[in-house]
C-alpha cells in the first residue's frame, strides 16, 4: 500500500460518541459530517436537534440513515458510549 492510499484510508475513519438516557440515545455528529453524508441533511427529523454545530442523531431513525450513508461511501464508523 502506498503512502497516499494509507492516508486516504485514514481519512475515511470517523469516531463518534453515542449519548444515552434511560429511554433513548443519540449519536453526536459534527454538522459538517452530516452535510458530507450524501442525501442525509434533508432527511434529518425534528427528533435530532442541532446544537453548537453538532447534530444529535436520534437512534430510531436518523442515526441509522447517517450510518448507512457513511458506510456506503466507504467510511469506517467507530462509536463509543458515554
What does each of the following model-derived ranges do?
Residues 1-5, 30-31, 53-54:
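Short linear motifs at secondary-structure transitions and domain/linker junctions
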Residues 1-16:
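N-terminal, charge-rich interaction modules
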Residues 3-5, 49, 60, 71:
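Structural boundary micro-motifs
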Residues 12, 32, 51-54, 68:
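Context-gated lysine
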Residues 12-13, 36-39, 45, 63-65, ...:
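Low-complexity, compositionally biased segments
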Residues 21-51:
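A short, structured beta-strand/loop element
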Residues 56-82:
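Short, compact, well-ordered microdomains
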Amino acid at each position: 500500500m502506498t503512502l497516499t492510499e494509507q492516508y486516504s484510508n485514514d481519512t475515511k475513519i470517523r469516531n463518534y460518541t453515542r449519548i444515552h438516557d434511560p429511554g433513548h440515545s443519540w449519536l453526536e455528529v459534527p454538522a459538517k459530517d452530516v452535510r458530507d453524508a450524501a442525501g442525509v441533511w434533508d432527511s434529518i427529523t425534528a427528533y435530532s436537534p442541532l446544537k453548537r454545530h453538532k447534530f444529535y442523531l436520534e437512534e430510531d431513525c436518523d442515526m441509522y440513515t447517517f450510518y448507512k450513508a457513511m458506510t456506503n461511501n466507504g467510511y469506517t464508523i467507530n462509536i463509543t458510549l458515554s
